[in-house]
């Protein structure tokens, strides 16, 4: 069927229009900049979406031949420290720069140094010392068996028994024995001193045995023998038993039963009451003061065989002296006691700690004045003891007002020489025994 003239003319017109459109499209694409060409193409059958026009990110990504070319400047990586650079193996390298000292004639202050002189002043060498920090730390934390040498045992046992504190306990016991009325019996005095010393060693050893987990957290006690593992807990308990049994036996059989009972009661009070109470209540300070006040009473009972008013006066002096002594000491160790988990006045009640210290400093004045009233000393004693009692009271007042480390240290160091001097003055001013009203000490 032959096409009509109208159909032929329509096809011819359509072909001309299509050719014109193709020609214009071709010219437009050739005249467009090359950098916008990828926005008009269908690459890898992916049509243009609105994501390509997100100019807020300031990032232009060209996807050609299935590869991405990022035209944004990469973010700089953090610069490692030049002094310590950790490697993957846990080691560390420390660089130590050794600089040659500048010689005075090398540079003149009147002219500007040139580049060659500045180069000469640079470090001569850089020494790199590889320190195996990770390995050393691992070796330090590794468990090591500590072998006990025989010649080290006396020193370890001395630290276990707190030999300095034991010496102070024995000296106060000796002062109580010497201040008691009646003749001085040397065999009884020696037995009392030995028995009291053994009882003190036993109490201190048991105290350290119970407080190992807490002493390890304190700088003041972290080097104790049980904490460091220098001796076993079994050896510590065995040593305490070997001290407690003969000590109490000597006091009971060699001196008198009253003194032995006081020694046994003091061991119980220190180990079973004071030691656990340190982590429960601040009342441990008052209980500990009672423990420290019993030794001079034991010395008095060893000489007289009875509890008189003079024994309680000596116990009261030791009781009051311990508060300024210990409260001032604990004030500088508040962080240590907190780390160890102990409940101390200086940590939980700092105001009460200072008030109690001042209160008992003033109590020493009253107790010293009561000594001649009870016929223990002459009236010369309170007069001679007035300066040292007034001085410790002044330091107690400064500690109460200032509440700082300096005032606490001054009060603590004053208490160290105050007690020996006060007891020495009491012995010097002791009232002579009249008429033999006190018989010889019982065997």
UniProtKB/Swiss-Prot annotation:
> Which reactions appear under catalytic activity for this entry?
heme b + (2E,6E)-farnesyl diphosphate + H2O = Fe(II)-heme o + diphosphate
How would you describe this protein's topology in the membrane? Multi-pass membrane protein
Q: What InterPro entries is this protein classified in?
A: Protohaem_IX_farnesylTrfase (IPR006369), Protohaem_IX_farnesylTrfase_mt (IPR016315), UbiA_prenyltransferase (IPR000537), UbiA_prenylTrfase_CS (IPR030470), UbiA_sf (IPR044878)
Q: What Enzyme Commission number(s) does the record list for this chain?
A: 2.5.1.141
Query: What domain of life does the native source organism fall in?
Result: Eukaryota
Q: Which GO terms describe its molecular function?
A: geranylgeranyl diphosphate synthase activity; protoheme IX farnesyltransferase activity
Q: What is its main location?
A: mitochondrion
Provide the alphabetized UniProt keywords.
Disease variant, Heme biosynthesis, Leigh syndrome, Lipid metabolism, Membrane, Mitochondrion, Primary mitochondrial disease, Transferase, Transit peptide, Transmembrane, Transmembrane helix
**Ion transport listed as a keyword:** no
Q: What does this protein do?
A: Converts protoheme IX and farnesyl diphosphate to heme O.
Q: Which family does it belong to?
A: Belongs to the UbiA prenyltransferase family.
Q: What's the disease link here?
A: Mitochondrial complex IV deficiency, nuclear type 3: An autosomal recessive mitochondrial disorder characterized by cytochrome c oxidase deficiency. Clinical features include muscle weakness, hypotonia, ataxia, ptosis, metabolic acidosis, poor feeding, delayed motor development, anemia, sensorineural hearing loss, and cardiomyopathy.
Name of the protein in question: Protoheme IX farnesyltransferase, mitochondrial
Lineage, highest ranks first: Eukaryota, Metazoa, Chordata, Craniata, Vertebrata
């Amino acid at each position: 069927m032959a096409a009509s003239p109208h159909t032929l003319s329509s096809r011819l017109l359509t072909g001309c229009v299509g050719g014109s459109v193709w020609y214009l499209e071709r010219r437009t694409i050739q005249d467009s900049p090359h950098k916008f060409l990828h926005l008009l193409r269908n690459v890898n059958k992916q049509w243009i979406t609105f994501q390509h026009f997100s100019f807020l990110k300031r990032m232009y990504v060209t996807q050609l031949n299935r590869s991405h070319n990022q035209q944004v400047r990469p973010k700089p990586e953090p610069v490692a420290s030049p002094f310590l650079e950790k490697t993957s193996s846990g080691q560390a390298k420390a660089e130590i720069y050794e600089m040659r000292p500048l010689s005075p004639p090398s540079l003149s202050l009147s002219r500007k140094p040139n580049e060659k002189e500045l180069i000469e002043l640079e470090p001569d060498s850089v020494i790199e010392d590889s320190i195996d920090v990770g390995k050393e730390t691992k070796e330090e934390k590794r468990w090591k068996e500590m072998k006990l040498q025989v010649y080290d045992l006396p020193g370890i046992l001395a630290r276990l028994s707190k030999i300095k504190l034991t010496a102070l306990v024995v000296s106060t016991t000796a002062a109580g024995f010497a201040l008691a009325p009646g003749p001085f019996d040397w065999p009884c005095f020696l037995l009392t001193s030995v028995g009291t010393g053994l009882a003190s060693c036993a109490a201190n050893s048991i105290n350290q045995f119970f407080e190992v987990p807490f002493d390890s957290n304190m700088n003041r006690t972290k080097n104790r023998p049980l904490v460091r593992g220098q001796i076993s807990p079994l050896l510590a308990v065995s040593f305490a038993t070997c001290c407690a049994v003969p000590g109490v036996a000597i006091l009971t059989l060699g001196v008198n039963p009253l003194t032995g009972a006081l020694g046994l009661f003091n061991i119980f009070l220190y180990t079973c009451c004071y030691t656990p109470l340190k982590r429960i209540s601040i009342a441990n300070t008052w209980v500990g003061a009672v423990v420290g006040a019993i030794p001079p009473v034991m010395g008095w009972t060893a000489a007289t065989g009875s509890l008189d008013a003079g024994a309680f006066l000596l116990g009261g002096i030791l009781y009051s002296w311990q508060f300024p002594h210990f409260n001032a000491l604990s004030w500088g160790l508040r962080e240590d006691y907190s780390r160890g988990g102990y409940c101390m006045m200086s940590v939980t009640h700092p105001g009460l700690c200072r008030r109690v210290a001042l209160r008992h400093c003033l109590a020493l004045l009253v107790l010293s004045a009561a000594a001649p009233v009870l016929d223990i000393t002459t009236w010369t004693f309170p007069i001679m003891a007035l300066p040292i009692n007034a001085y410790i009271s002044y330091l107690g007042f400064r500690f109460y007002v200032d509440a700082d480390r300096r005032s606490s240290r001054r009060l603590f160091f004053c208490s160290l020489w105050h007690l020996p001097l006060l007891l020495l003055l009491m012995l010097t001013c002791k009232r002579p025994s009249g008429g033999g009203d006190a018989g010889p000490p019982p065997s």
